[in-house]
A protein has these predicted regions:
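Perimembrane loop-to-helix junctions flanking transmembrane segments
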Residues: 32-48
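Pore domain of cation channels
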Residues: 159-167, 173-212
C-alpha cells in the first residue's frame, strides 16, 4: 500500500477550494432561485447559509493568497479549511434537503431535473474529495490506504485519487479498492452515501415520473 498523503500543496489546495465554491454556488442558485418560491421560509435559511459560506470562502482565499506570497503554511490553516468545509457540507445538505422536500411539487422540464442531479453529484464529489484529502493528510497514520502503483510503488496519493474515491462513493455507496481506517473518514463516507441515496431514490425517481 502507498504511504499517506503529504502536506496539502498550495495551488492544488486553492484549485479544489474554488471548485467546491463554484459547485456550491451553482447548486444554491438552482435551489433558491429556480426551485423555491419567494414565500418559502427555507429560502431565507438557504440564503443565510450561502452568505456564511461566501464569507468563509473569502477568508480561506485571503489566507491562501498569503500562503503564496509568504511561502509559508501556518498550521492553523487546517482549522480555517475545516470551518469552510463544514459550512460547505451543511449548505450541501440543506440544498439537497430542499430539492428532496420539494421534489413532488416540481413542475419543471426533464432536462432541468437532470441538471439538478448533476449539480448535486458534482458538489458532493468535490466537497468530500477535499474532506478525504484533508483527513488523510492530518490524521495520525492517515485515513486511507490506496492500492500500490507497480510502476511507482513510493508514489503518494494525489488529488485524482481522492476525487476518484469520492466519485466511487457516490456511484457505489462506498469505497472500491481503498481501505478506510479512520472513524472520522467512515462517518464522512456515511454522510456522502446518505446524500447519494437521497438523490437516487427521490430525485431520480422524480425524473422517471416526469418522463412517463
Amino acid at each position: 500500500m502507498v504511504r499517506r498523503a503529504g502536506a496539502l500543496p498550495t495551488w492544488s489546495f486553492i484549485g479544489m477550494i474554488v471548485a467546491v465554491q463554484v459547485a456550491d454556488r451553482l447548486l444554491a442558485h438552482q435551489v433558491t432561485f429556480d426551485r423555491l418560491a419567494d414565500d418559502v421560509p427555507a429560502r431565507d435559511v438557504l440564503r443565510a447559509g450561502q452568505a456564511v459560506g461566501d464569507v468563509v470562502f473569502l477568508a480561506v482565499a485571503l489566507v491562501a493568497v498569503g500562503m503564496v506570497l509568504l511561502h509559508s503554511r501556518p498550521r492553523w490553516i487546517n482549522a480555517v479549511l475545516v470551518a469552510y468545509l463544514s459550512v460547505a457540507t451543511i449548505n450541501l445538505v440543506l440544498n439537497v434537503g430542499a430539492l428532496v422536500a420539494t421534489a413532488d411539487q416540481m413542475r419543471v422540464a426533464h432536462l432541468a431535473l437532470l441538471w439538478d442531479v448533476g449539480l448535486v453529484y458534482l458538489s458532493t464529489v468535490f466537497v468530500f474529495a477535499l474532506w478525504y484529502r484533508l483527513l488523510d493528510c492530518e490524521l495520525t497514520g492517515g485515513a486511507f490506504e490506496f492500492p500500490v502503483d507497480p510502476a511507482r510503488p513510493d508514489r503518494r496519493p494525489g488529488w485524482i485519487d481522492y476525487v476518484f474515491l469520492s466519485f466511487n462513493t457516490n456511484a457505489t455507496f462506498g469505497p472500491t479498492a481503498e481501505v478506510v481506517h479512520a472513524r472520522t473518514a467512515k462517518v464522512a463516507m456515511m454522510v456522502q452515501t446518505l446524500i447519494s441515496l437521497l438523490v437516487l431514490v427521490v430525485l431520480v425517481a422524480r425524473i422517471v415520473g416526469v418522463g412517463q
